[in-house]
C-alpha cells in the first residue's frame, strides 16, 4: 500500500481545497484507522451499530492534530466512499471537538467537484440542519457505552477557522518530520 503521507500533499489550504484520504465509509461502524508506521489501514475496533459514522471519515496527509494523529476530516457525500479513496475536497468548516480531554478537531468538507449537487455546499449553513444534528449527536455520544461523558462537540467554525486549524496541524507535522 502507498504511504499517503509520502505521495500526497495537504493541498491548497489557502484556496480552500485539500487532499483527503478516506478511512471510514459513511454508515460504517468499523473504526478503521490509518497506521502511519505500517502505511496501512487497520481495523481498530467495531463500534455498536447505533454509532455508525454519519459521514465519511478520513484525514489530511502531512498534518498532525493535537492528539498526535493526522487531522481528521468529515467528508459529506451522498454515497459512502471506500476506505483508501483519496480526493480533493473543499473546506466548509470545522467541528471543534474534545475527546477524553484532548483536542481532536474535525475539518468538514465536501468533494471539490460535485456535479450531482451542483457544488451547492459552500458553508456549514448550506448543509441540512438534520445532518449537523446527527454529526453532533454521534460525536457527543459514540463513547457513552464504554465511558460516558468523555467526548464533547464544543462549537462549529467557518472555513477560515478550519484553514487556521489545518495550518497549525501542518506546522506540527513539519516539526516532527
UniProtKB/Swiss-Prot annotation:
It catalyses: diphosphate + H2O = 2 phosphate + H(+). GO terms for biological process: phosphate-containing compound metabolic process. Its main location: cytoplasm. GO terms for molecular function: inorganic diphosphate phosphatase activity; magnesium ion binding. Its cofactor is Mg(2+). It is an enzyme of class 3 (hydrolase). Keywords: Cytoplasm, Hydrolase, Magnesium, Metal-binding. Its EC number is 3.6.1.1. Gene3D superfamilies: Inorganic pyrophosphatase. The keyword Heme does not apply. It is found in: Cytoplasm. Mg(2+) 1 binds at residues 67, 72, 104. Catalyzes the hydrolysis of inorganic pyrophosphate (PPi) forming two phosphate ions. Homohexamer. Belongs to the PPase family. This is Inorganic pyrophosphatase. It comes from Neisseria meningitidis serogroup A / serotype 4A (strain DSM 15465 / Z2491). The lineage of its organism: Bacteria, Pseudomonadati, Pseudomonadota, Betaproteobacteria, Neisseriales.
